[in-house]
Each structure stands twice: as structure tokens, then as C-alpha cells.
UniProtKB/Swiss-Prot annotation:
Organism name: Synechococcus sp. (strain RCC307)
Molecular function as annotated in GO: 3-dehydroquinate dehydratase activity
Reactions performed catalytically: 3-dehydroquinate = 3-dehydroshikimate + H2O
Protein's name according to its UniProt entry: 3-dehydroquinate dehydratase
InterPro entries: DHquinase_II, DHquinase_II_CS, DHquinase_II_sf
Length: 147
């Protein structure tokens, strides 16, 4: 099973950007641990980060013929991007929305998601563990849908 992991804007700054909120792990450290977890679960991951909405949309569209599911931390695009929502709906792949911080304990504008109502699940607030929980959930979802 192949899973695309998408990291949105500013996630390339993990480790140095507001470590009290997002933790000290870098994105490359999170991706490396996620790859190890995926191997243990029998999944293959492709990880991609961009600060550009169109690049994320391109990856989602490409995933339609190459992937079985998507994990997405769209960052600020979660609250603004109809384009990412439309791309996710167009490819018809299951996806999990995730966030490092608890978006519901933050500013009001972060409480709204353009993705959550179409996601298989939403995980937030556990720091880097949010990624690992999202992967576990996606693998379980894909396995149960194959029965």
C-alpha cells in the first residue's frame, strides 16, 4: 500500500518555528520516523512539502494513479484552500487531515477546516505523534476497506 504524506506551508521550519507550539523535531526527523513506522506496517510512503498551494494540488492529482491514500497537514491552507479540497475530492482517495497543534485551542480562524468534513479522520494536538497516529489510522482504514 502506498501513502502520500503532504506537508503544507511553513512546515519546513519545524524545529525552529515556535518550538513551544510545534515541538523541536525537524520535518526531516518526522519523515524519517514516519518512514520507519510505515515499513513496520507494510506501507510505502512518499513525503512532500511545499509552501505553494499549486504544488500541493499537483501532488494530490498525481497521487490518483499512484497512491492508495493521503495524509495531509495542509497548515494554513486547511482554513483557506478550496483548491486543495477540490483536488482531494477529485482524486477520490481516502485522506486523513492532521495538525501538530490543537487547532481548536488556538485562534478562532483556525477552528474551520475546508478538509475535515471529507476526511476519513482528523488528528490534531499531539505534536509529531499526530503524524504517527494518522499513519496508523490510514493503514487500518485501507486494510479494512480491502476486506
Amino acid at each position: 500500500m502506498r501513502i502520500l504524506v503532504l506537508h503544507g506551508p511553513n512546515l519546513n521550519l519545524l524545529g525552529s518555528r515556535e518550538p513551544g507550539l510545534y515541538g523541536r523535531d525537524t520535518l526531516s526527523e518526522i519523515d524519517a520516523e514516519l518512514q520507519q513506522q510505515a515499513e513496520r506496517l507494510g506501507a510505502e510512503l512518499v513525503c512532500f512539502q511545499s509552501n505553494h498551494e499549486g504544488a500541493l494540488v499537483d501532488q494530490i492529482q498525481q497521487a490518483a494513479s499512484e497512491m492508495d491514500g493521503i495524509l495531509i497537514n495542509a497548515g494554513a491552507f486547511t482554513h483557506t484552500s478550496v483548491a486543495i479540497r477540490d483536488a482531494l475530492l477529485a482524486v477520490k482517495l481516502p485522506f486523513v487531515e492532521l495538525h501538530l497543534s490543537n487547532v481548536h485551542a488556538r485562534e478562532e480562524f483556525r477552528h474551520s477546516s475546508y478538509l475535515a468534513d471529507k476526511a476519513v479522520g482528523v488528528i490534531c494536538g499531539f505534536g509529531p505523534i499526530s503524524y504517527y497516529l494518522a499513519l496508523e489510522g490510514m493503514v487500518a482504514h485501507l486494510r479494512s476497506s480491502q476486506l
